[in-house]
């Protein structure tokens, strides 16, 4: 989890709680099924609630592997998740714990992540347009709540069984600072996220704004179109690893390398898609697509789809994951222990 000086949001139960949901207080309320995700500090299981028979994702975090600072950040993440409620966010239901583990109950997203799908095949612009407009809706919503995601990338975008894209994994998300100084307001401090998706202002100046999320979406958009990222991995990773003195001496070179306008791949897509990609990957945050929500919603690539329809989850996706297919690595079940 990344560093942040931001305060967590307060729990807004009135806005969050589903009146039809069961109150989850113990892992004994669930039947544990197969593993769908495994990280260095957590394992995610498919579970079925014994009473309602509903299926959920249960993330199990081992307390022994983390110090108090990391556990505190996790609890702040939970508070933030409880304040968000939108059809295109992976819904958070409950958090509880026992002596050794912390458990998070969320929506079960059986369609896999976007990374899996774009690595398997090339998709046309019509499919990608729907993905992007759903993510636009999700980002507009969290930004309206003063939240920056700070790690938008295909790995953190999950598909449900109907093919809807949902923004997930808020482990480095943060509330923006509020300050009487315009230069320090609506931002967070620190190089947080995944280097190859970080915006220039995050890489160079170690700050993030809402526009930084739009840059990351632009990289994701490009990757959906071409199955590769626009900028060399080594360039960005080496920058992160460099000393502050080295960063200062090479900032201009990095800034020059992050210009998308000369990319020949962009000539192979539609004019509207090309315009959107280039606008998301604009160096100047005040000119970047997303700085103005009105310009974003009226952009030619997106304007044919009503954001009101999208924000209610009523858009019908073109691509739908195959029913019954499990988009996870089967070896996970062999490696995981509960």
Swiss-Prot record:
The active site is at residue 151. PROSITE patterns: PROTEIN_KINASE_ATP (PS00107), PROTEIN_KINASE_DOM (PS50011), PROTEIN_KINASE_ST (PS00108). It comes from the Eukaryota. SMART domains: S_TKc. Keywords: ATP-binding, Kinase, Nucleotide-binding, Serine/threonine-protein kinase, Transferase. Residues 1-20 are annotated as: Disordered. Residues 30-302 form the Protein kinase domain. One of its GO terms (biological process) is intracellular signal transduction. It holds the Pfam family Pkinase. It catalyses: L-seryl-[protein] + ATP = O-phospho-L-seryl-[protein] + ADP + H(+); L-threonyl-[protein] + ATP = O-phospho-L-threonyl-[protein] + ADP + H(+). It is an enzyme of class 2 (transferase). Its EC number is 2.7.11.1. ATP binds at residues 36-44, 59. One of its GO terms (molecular function) is protein serine/threonine kinase activity. PANTHER family: PROTEIN KINASE DOMAIN-CONTAINING PROTEIN, SERINE/THREONINE-PROTEIN KINASE. Belongs to the protein kinase superfamily. Ser/Thr protein kinase family. This is Serine/threonine-protein kinase ppk33. The gene is ppk33.
